[in-house]
Amino acid sequence: MDIKNNHSQNPHACAGVGCDTDGWSGLFNYSRREAHEVNVGDTPLGGDNPIRVQSMTTTPTADTEACVDQAKRIIEAGGEYVRLTTQGVREAENLKNINVRLREEGITTPLVADVHFNPHVADVAALYAEKVRVNPGNYVDPARTFKKLEYTDEEYAEELKKIEKQFVPFLNICREHHTAVRIGVNHGSLSDRIMSRYGDTPAGIVESCMEFLRICKREDFKDVVISIKASNTVVMVESVRLLVDTMRREQMDYPLHLGVTEAGEGEDGRIKSAVGIGALLADGIGDTIRVSLSEEPEAEIPVARHLVDYITRRAGHT
């Protein structure tokens, strides 16, 4: 195969990041994509900051002691952000207690609330966490039913207005409380609306994210991180590259969070994460990563750090 010709025919093969026009320098020289800086507590990401590593607690977020203990283990292992699942208002409100306990011990590591299905929970979490993750697939759209729905252009536009009506007040809360936002798309939870128009495709995954990013841009809300995750590493890599290219064409430079869902445990989980995350890091894409393993959360940190160090050591190498 003529690699040069193949690359030139595929505009998303590199998305203009981490390689030159002939597609070869990215194999030997790391060059990171430019992204604007996002403030997440006292640990900003993007810009000239190092690639941040993070993990996620597995303890019930309503259990303050368990969450604090596990967060400390993640932080002691080198985690720079700690994410906590936030299923309901009770869990969102308890983020305050977890945050206070850690700060009392002199720990300032930012906490990230992971919210699904309930916009009101995101509003509450934004009061107490340094960053809130929302999933476009279920933020306003109902839970996926796998039904084929038909929308006229007018009906589709009305659905987008519903998202904006709910999302803009959330952004205003985040702006007031200096809370960052992650727009985190999961391949497995695309809405029926997106699926009906775009199918189960990278284009649909990207559009699910872009709908929210366009609102952020209109509202001049810059403290946004984005992610696209899939258990299939090929789908993940293709979708993220397409997202980067789409943002470039729409003059956006939001930083990216990288991760592979359901990576597993042991050697298999590490290899799967290295394939998906490593390919994108080699492209110069990625400002924070989480290696998702079916193990204790602190076990994820050394793997993530090794992956980042391996790729970034190539900077300036010729």
Feature locations, PLM:
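N-terminal amphipathic alpha-helix/helix-capping segment at the start of soluble metabolic enzymes
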Residues: D2-S55, L171, R175-H177, R313-T318
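Active-site mouth loops of central-metabolism enzymes
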Residues: S31, V40, G47-A66, T85-Q87, ...
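Conserved, mostly hydrophobic/aromatic
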Residues: V53, D114, I183, I226, ...
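Glycine-rich, proline-tolerant flexible connector loops at the mouths of alpha/beta enzymes
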Residues: T58, G78-L102, P136-E158, V224-T233
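Glycine-rich phosphate-binding active-site loops on the catalytic face of alpha/beta enzymes
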Residues: G78-R83, Y128-T145, A282-E298
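N-terminal active-site wall of soluble small-molecule enzyme domains
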Residues: T86-Y128
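Non-cysteine beta-strand/loop elements that form the S-adenosyl-L-methionine
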Residues: K131-N138, A180-G188, L256
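Catalytic alpha/beta core domains of metabolic enzymes, predominantly
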Residues: E150-F167, N172, M195-T318
